[in-house]
Amino acid sequence: LKSGATIEADIIVTATGLNLVTLGEIEFKVDGNEVDFAQTWTYKGLAYSDVPNLVSTFGYINASWTLRADVVANYSCRLLNHMKKTGTQQATPRLRAQDQGMKARPWIDDFSAGYMQRMMHLMPRQGDHAPWLNPQLIAVDKQMIVKSPIDDGAMQFTKAKALV
């Protein structure tokens, strides 16, 4: 205290850290095959390569969490509106020819908190160019997510397969 007095503690709580998990540890399957998110690439920090119709929100690590949630929600609405307009049922981010040789980077760069480092091996990789980035910067996200076209060549739109 500023006065120099001390207050005895009744209890001291020590924490070893938060353990994050990927998407709530829900088992996702695509065409019967389990998805290993560590083998995917992050698409704009909100979707996963070769996983159709899935968008998730992970807020900013250095700004308001809800700020990014709003950006992702806006993108999701634009994506759904595009699908309705084009009559497509699946939106799947896929690596293009020019993306094949990308240098892999951690899902989130330059954040050393233990809770993040302990789970980084479970998360998708980040590339070295858009749209395969998770920049964690609102100015970059506004260009890459809010202002860029939905049909950017990496997001593939298809009609649902007929059930046999």
What are these regions (language model features)?
Residues 53-164:
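C-terminal, flexible cofactor-proximal segment of oxidoreductases
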Residues 1-70, 74-81, 153-164:
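Flavin (primarily FAD) cofactor-binding/catalytic cores of flavoenzymes
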